[in-house]
């Protein structure tokens, strides 16, 4: 068996417009795929450098037949490297993103903050400290 050739995290979004404002508008993801190709997307892929993120619209139906959301807590968090954690938190707060952890220098040499995306997924923002 050959090793996997690619791993792409996928998130569910209740409002694709709000998800795009967060991931494309503020964090700078580049839309590289949309389905359907015209009109309002139900799925899209964004590229961040060499990494890709899939976002699917919550529809109530899944291919696997399981709920799209956990009963409580969270099952995934994203870690996104940015140039300026503080400026990014200000911009995301400006579009209504809740801040779970204000920017703070970490002992391992990074400045980090946590915000929630429009669907409550935790997003860790990191940059080199100092």
Q: Where does each model-flagged region fall?
A:
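Vicinal oxygen chelate
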Residues: 1-10, 30-81, 87-116, 126-130
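Short acidic-aromatic low-complexity motifs
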Residues: 13-17
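Charged catalytic carboxylate motif
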Residues: 18, 84
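Conserved active-site tyrosine of GNAT-family acetyltransferases
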Residues: 19-24, 92, 120
């Amino acid at each position: 068996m050959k090793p996997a050739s690619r791993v792409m995290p996928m998130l569910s979004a209740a409002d694709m417009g709000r998800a795009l404002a967060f991931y494309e508008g503020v964090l700078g993801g580049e839309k590289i795929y949309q389905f359907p190709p015209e009109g309002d997307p139900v799925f899209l892929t964004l590229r961040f450098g060499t990494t890709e993120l899939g976002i699917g619209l919550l529809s109530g139906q899944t291919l696997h037949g399981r709920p799209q959301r956990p009963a409580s807590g969270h099952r995934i968090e994203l870690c996104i490297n940015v140039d300026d954690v503080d400026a990014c938190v200000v911009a995301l707060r400006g579009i209504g993103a809740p801040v779970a952890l204000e920017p703070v220098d970490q002992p391992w040499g990074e400045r980090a903050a946590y915000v929630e995306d429009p669907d409550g997924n935790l997003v860790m923002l990191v940059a080199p400290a100092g």
